[in-house]
């Protein structure tokens, strides 16, 4: 009988090392299609950058539109925000108050003043008129202002739903905070790490605001069937090995599930994801419908006073 020896573990035969049960599943990152820099589109004296829509990117279904106002400083005795009474139909608006405040009033009887760190979510549905202006205190005293407004589409079945509004001050928004304090996530709708958002979306949209300190890192898993909305409000981040900075929107492919985020400096990111509606979108002015005929009807209804008035 010849000499017998035992192979060290590291030299086990390949058919043992590569057994089906020995593989470790490595999550694959979503690939990035393109980085879009916002276009500068001032409104009177209001600093405004618009990353969506642009000539290169029409929508991230169902995310339709984003305006980033500021940051800027208003002097005392200013005119404040210029968004007086105007109508909407067929969509929703989500307003992020990073700094400053905003007074909301609409023909559905809703009225509020939301301050720094707060959120407003309005469902226009079948139609209403609203105004978004600065508070009297802000106009008198001035101060820092930075506000973003995101438009969300509504599917055909909900275009004519009942209008609704809900405002949240910063302290009212559920939040996830990491153990080391480097990550704070305001969960607006949907769920994040067991924290349920403050708003119940009609269309299962997830929306959150990520506040990241320099050096913080975060990994998320988002199903491939959901489109991702990712916009850098402040600072610099590296997402799936690609750098992105303030005023940039990251467009993803729907190929994998993992989102890995690292902050190069203190940063704020708006993160959303949703299943696309895959419906025709006809947007004209403040109305978002499925056909030109529906747009014409919206204008006619508004002119006939069917949206109400202040």
Range-by-range predicted roles:
Residues 2-310:
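Jelly-roll (double-stranded beta-helix
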